[in-house]
Amino acid sequence: MAKHPNQTGWYYNENNCIACRACEAGCKQEFDLPVGVRRRRVIIREEGKYPNPKVRYLSTACNHCEEPSCMKACPVGAYTKEKIFGVVLIDQGKCIGCKRCAAACPYGAPVFDEKKSKMDKCTFCIHRLSEGLPPACVRTCPGYALWHGKLPDIEEQRTPPGIYRRPLTKTLPGFADPKLTGPSVRFSENK
């Protein structure tokens, strides 16, 4: 699959995340998601030993990958890569709930909706992007730990304006190898 010219991506600044889970709540509220279905998750990792322990936070969702493993694994073609923003979407009308996409995704993005017996995942709030608005998770993050934009703009630090000026990385501890699927996310690591 060729690189999408306007690929929308995530930016996550580990230094600004306080693990308040406002991003999770904003997403759940935007989509009225049932208990057990979380399109965005804050992962808390403890590292090190006394006297130098460290706690790290990672807010993660679907990374709308360049080479989506979920799409390749789906036996009924329920996944597509949308043309305007490069967002990976699932057609729940086609989904048979086999969970192969969840098994294939190294980032744990697709989740099973027990009520619908279908898979669910982050849509990057494409309905909001289409109106020029930020995704719900970005809108609700009080610490500006989460941002979105065109991936080239994020990589060249043109967006978000004034929020960061640190070296970017394609991975953090606890995040799967980006060489697997080409995730559309960049990080500023906690220093």
Located regions from the model:
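Non-ligating segments of multi-cofactor redox enzymes
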Residues: 1-191
